[in-house]
């Protein structure tokens, strides 16, 4: 069979078929990758500079994100910080409160504009996911948070009796909904964050017995999966004032996965952004720690990490200078714990494999 070497003829045929596809399916249905308007993935700050580094810049826009972990580990806090960041940049944010547990006072303390926040408290999982799909398709909303997947109860389960068995109903619901939602997300550029809970698998003798609710569909469709854990309780004397948390990027389709970030969450205030700055300034050598003392340019600024954070709070101009120096070092390729890839465990590697979602 002769190979067609007529380049101009091929180009003419290609132009004709591209025009025909665009007439049939709309402009933008097919394009050269170099012509795409969104070659670089835009990001939303998570509120923690260390987590932004671990994510390769922040939470990606126009993607499905899953945040999961044990109770009171900071899942909703990270999601609320993302909402606040979008609102600060003039975007519209929505919160689907399936758990009926949103605290407006805490959200406001984290910087969320609660007066302009769209909130829905649906009764069934079908209603919640249909609302999410309509918000995404509108292309008017920039970010939607669903709290949580475990609370998306199928209508049949709500209307049935207490002891009825409903095997796989929620997994099928999530699979059907995500097939619709992901296609619309790509067109609208809306970020959808699912908060999820952990459950224990019964009879597991090898590997981690932990699993997330809602089946495998969300694992498959999510571009980013964040595993957040509380690793330390922060105390002043006997009074607890916050938690130290560790976030593992269990899956990332837009940057290297398996990075780990640590930061503080202060009760009533949210993520300690200046705590992240102090940690990164120390790792990059901008602030030097000798024993308990922290120094900058040879001058002692505080004794102890908490006092170093307090010093930056009291001197915002100095804090901005340190932030700028940290970012410059990181832009030049400085390697810190948050942007170095941690060794993946066997459980991580199993999690990264994309399984076909169950029907």
Curated annotation (Swiss-Prot):
Q: Which Pfam families match?
A: RecA, RecA_C
Q: Which InterPro entries match?
A: AAA+_ATPase, DNA_recomb/repair_RecA, DNA_recomb/repair_RecA_CS, P-loop_NTPase, RecA-like_C, RecA-like_N, RecA_ATP-bd, RecA_C_sf
* GO MF term list: ATP binding; ATP hydrolysis activity; ATP-dependent DNA damage sensor activity; damaged DNA binding; single-stranded DNA binding
Provide the GO biological process annotations: DNA recombination; DNA repair; SOS response
Which Gene3D superfamilies does the entry link to?
P-loop containing nucleotide triphosphate hydrolases
Q: Where is the composition biased (Acidic residues)?
A: 346-359
Chain sites annotated for binding ATP: 69-76
Its cellular-component GO annotations read: cytosol
State where the protein is found: Cytoplasm
Spell out the residue ranges making up region: Disordered: 337-359
UniProt KW keywords: ATP-binding, Cytoplasm, DNA damage, DNA recombination, DNA repair, DNA-binding, Nucleotide-binding, SOS response
Q: Source organism's superkingdom?
A: Bacteria
Q: Where is the signal peptide?
A: none
Q: Per its UniProt record, what NCBIfam families does this chain match? A: tigrfam_recA
Q: Which family does it belong to?
A: Belongs to the RecA family.
Q: What does this protein do?
A: Can catalyze the hydrolysis of ATP in the presence of single-stranded DNA, the ATP-dependent uptake of single-stranded DNA by duplex DNA, and the ATP-dependent hybridization of homologous single-stranded DNAs. It interacts with LexA causing its activation and leading to its autocatalytic cleavage.
The name on file for this protein is Protein RecA
Organism, by scientific name, is Nostoc punctiforme (strain ATCC 29133 / PCC 73102)
């Amino acid at each position: 069979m002769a190979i067609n070497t007529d380049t101009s003829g091929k180009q003419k045929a290609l132009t004709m078929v591209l025009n025909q596809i665009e007439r049939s399916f709309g402009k933008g249905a097919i394009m050269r990758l170099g012509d795409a308007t969104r070659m670089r993935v835009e990001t939303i700050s998570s509120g923690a500079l260390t987590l932004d580094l671990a994510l390769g810049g922040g939470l990606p826009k126009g993607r499905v994100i899953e945040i999961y972990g044990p109770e009171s580990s900071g899942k909703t806090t990270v999601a609320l910080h993302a909402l606040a960041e979008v609102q600060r940049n003039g975007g519209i944010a929505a919160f689907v409160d399936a758990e009926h547990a949103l605290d407006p006072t805490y959200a406001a303390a984290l910087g969320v504009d609660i007066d302009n926040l769209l909130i829905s408290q649906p009764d069934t999982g079908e209603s919640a996911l249909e609302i999410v799909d309509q918000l995404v398709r509108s292309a008017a909303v920039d970010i939607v948070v669903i709290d949580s997947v475990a609370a998306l109860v199928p209508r049949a389960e709500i209307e049935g009796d207490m002891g009825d068995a409903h095997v796989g109903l929620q997994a099928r619901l999530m699979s059907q909904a995500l097939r619709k939602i992901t296609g619309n997300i790509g067109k609208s550029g809306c970020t959808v964050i699912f908060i999820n809970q952990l459950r224990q698998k019964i009879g597991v003798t090898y590997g981690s017995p932990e699993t997330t609710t809602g089946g495998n569909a969300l694992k498959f469709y999510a571009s980013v999966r964040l595993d957040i854990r509380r690793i330390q309780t922060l105390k002043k004397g006997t009074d607890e004032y916050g938690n130290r948390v560790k976030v593992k990027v269990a899956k990332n389709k837009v940057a290297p996965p398996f990075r780990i970030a640590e930061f503080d969450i202060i009760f009533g205030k949210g993520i300690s952004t200046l705590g992240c700055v102090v940690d990164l300034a120390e790792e990059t050598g901008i602030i030097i720690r000798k024993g308990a003392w922290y120094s900058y340019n040879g001058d002692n600024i505080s004794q102890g990490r908490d006092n170093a954070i307090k010093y930056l709070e009291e001197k915002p101009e100095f804090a901005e200078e340190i932030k700028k120096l940290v970012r410059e070092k990181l832009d030049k390729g400085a390697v810190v714990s948050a942007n170095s890839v941690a060794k993946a465990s066997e459980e991580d590697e199993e999690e990264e494999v994309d399984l076909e979602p169950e029907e």
